[in-house]
Amino acid sequence: MSRGKHGETVGSITAAFPHWFCKNYQKYAWKEETLPFDQHQLVACVAPRLCYITSGSEDRWSDPDAEWNGAKSASCAWELFGDAPLPSQPPANDSGYLTGRIGYHRRTGGHDITRWDWAMFLRFLDFHNG
């Protein structure tokens, strides 16, 4: 989520990586509260398809709490299609929620994609696709 988060902001990411974004997005740099939407609303547009979100517990720049809050907030869209919402609390480190069509895990560590992350991605897909 961009509003009220710690770590990476629209201003910092558009300054560091302007080529990743359209120029219009830069007008919200340092003014995230004026965005007409937030990231959980974009994630909700994926419903009812599968969606999987991950966090590293020590990745303060990406803000794992905001990533969890975004996943939890977006899960209401999957509820409209009969899925249970994500639980109210994030999973413990090195575990996750895989049974809903929106899944999430939090791994101990920083900004990375590890073998453990890949194993969790595959478990999520195996659960849903057999």
Regions inferred by a protein language model and the residue ranges of each:
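Mobile cap/lid helix-loop segments that gate and shape the active-site cleft of serine hydrolases
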Residues: 1-42, 67-88
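C-terminal catalytic histidine-bearing segment of alpha/beta-hydrolase fold enzymes
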Residues: 12, 16, 26, 72-130
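Conserved alpha/beta-hydrolase "acid-adjacent" motif
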Residues: 35, 60-70, 114-117
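Short, proline-enriched alpha-helix->beta-strand connector loops that line the catalytic pocket
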Residues: 45-51, 98-102
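Conserved strand-to-loop "acid loop" that flanks and positions the catalytic carboxylate
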Residues: 47-65, 107-110
